[in-house]
């Protein structure tokens, strides 16, 4: 299986999984034209679309893609029904595509119906967990987001994190604001600055690596707790919520 991505809008990625025979699936097509053009240019055969949630930068191209490829399956949670979904998914579902099993995880927090798709070694998690960060939390659903991130971070360390936005640099800058003396994050920040200047991507990342650079996965770290004014006895969730609120105001 080959993993590719198509850049759209200002910082979105549409992920593509492709097998050796040229059949493919795509995840969260926020636009239609660049996706259709790439599929036609590469002579791929689109089999399915997977949607993680209902925000327009993840779903905006779906209906036109369906018009162009009317036989495809479109999977998504209930909140994405208006975007042409013909197969509603929920937590615990198993989907077989391209001879691979995709497990559906309910990962709310960013939206109330957000889902993620796991097919070893890939986790397509939309706007839940980002490299060095996590998605915005709406309607004060911090506990839901915390639990969703726990689901993703509990996957094997070798799992490839395929999130939907190129936010890594900004997230690392926030991490340095919180932990200015973390040399590992400092070095990685410099590396990402160089990659982005060269027109390269920071994604995908690995779960094991995220546990080092992503403060939202370091909620039991006493250095993190101290840096945001919490006692060492506080809960991991308290750390998560404080970090997320700080990130909201920082950015």
Swiss-Prot record:
Enzyme Commission designation: 3.1.2.6
Domain of life per record: Bacteria
Alphabetical UniProt keywords: Hydrolase, Metal-binding, Zinc
Record text on cofactor binding: Binds 2 Zn(2+) ions per subunit.
Cofactor (UniProt): Zn(2+)
Residues annotated for Zn(2+) 1 binding in this entry: 53, 55, 110, 127
GO annotation, biological process: methylglyoxal catabolic process to D-lactate via S-lactoyl-glutathione
Reactions it catalyzes: an S-(2-hydroxyacyl)glutathione + H2O = a 2-hydroxy carboxylate + glutathione + H(+)
GO molecular function, one term: metal ion binding
Matches recorded under Pfam families: HAGH_C, Lactamase_B
Residue ranges that the Swiss-Prot or TrEMBL entry lists as coiled coil: none
Binding positions for Zn(2+) 2 per the UniProt entry: 57-58, 127, 165
Record-linked NCBIfam families: GSH_gloB (TIGR03413)
Function: Thiolesterase that catalyzes the hydrolysis of S-D-lactoyl-glutathione to form glutathione and D-lactic acid.
Subunit structure: Monomer.
Family statement drawn from the similarity comment of this UniProt entry: Belongs to the metallo-beta-lactamase superfamily. Glyoxalase II family.
Name this polypeptide is given: Hydroxyacylglutathione hydrolase
The organism of origin for this protein: Buchnera aphidicola subsp. Acyrthosiphon pisum (strain APS) (Acyrthosiphon pisum symbiotic bacterium)
Taxonomic path: Bacteria, Pseudomonadati, Pseudomonadota, Gammaproteobacteria, Enterobacterales
């Amino acid at each position: 299986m080959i993993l590719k991505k198509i850049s759209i809008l200002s910082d979105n990625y549409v992920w593509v999984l492709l097998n050796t025979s040229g059949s493919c699936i795509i995840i969260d097509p926020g636009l239609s034209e660049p996706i259709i053009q790439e599929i036609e240019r590469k002579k791929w055969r689109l089999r399915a679309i997977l949607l993680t949630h209902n925000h327009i930068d993840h779903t905006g191209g779906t209906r036109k893609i369906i018009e162009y490829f009317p036989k495809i399956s479109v999977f998504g949670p209930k909140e994405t029904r208006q975007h042409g979904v013909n197969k509603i998914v929920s937590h615990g579902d198993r989907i077989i595509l391209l001879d691979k099993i995709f497990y559906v995880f309910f990962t709310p927090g960013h939206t109330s119906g957000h889902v993620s798709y796991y097919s070893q070694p890939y986790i397509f998690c939309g706007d839940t967990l980002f490299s060095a960060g996590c998605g915005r939390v709406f309607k004060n659903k911090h506990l839901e987001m915390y639990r969703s991130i726990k689901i993703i971070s509990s996957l094997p360390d070798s799992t490839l994190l395929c999130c939907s936005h190129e936010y890594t640099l900004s997230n690392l800058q926030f991490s340095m604001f919180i932990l200015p003396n973390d040399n590992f994050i400092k070095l990685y920040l410099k590396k990402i600055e160089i990659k982005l200047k060269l027109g390269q991507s920071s994604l995908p990342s690995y779960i094991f690596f995220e546990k080092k650079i992503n403060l939202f996965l370091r909620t039991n770290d006493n250095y993190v707790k101290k840096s945001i004014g919490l006692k060492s006895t506080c809960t991991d969730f308290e750390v998560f919520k404080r970090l997320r609120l700080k990130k909201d105001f920082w950015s």
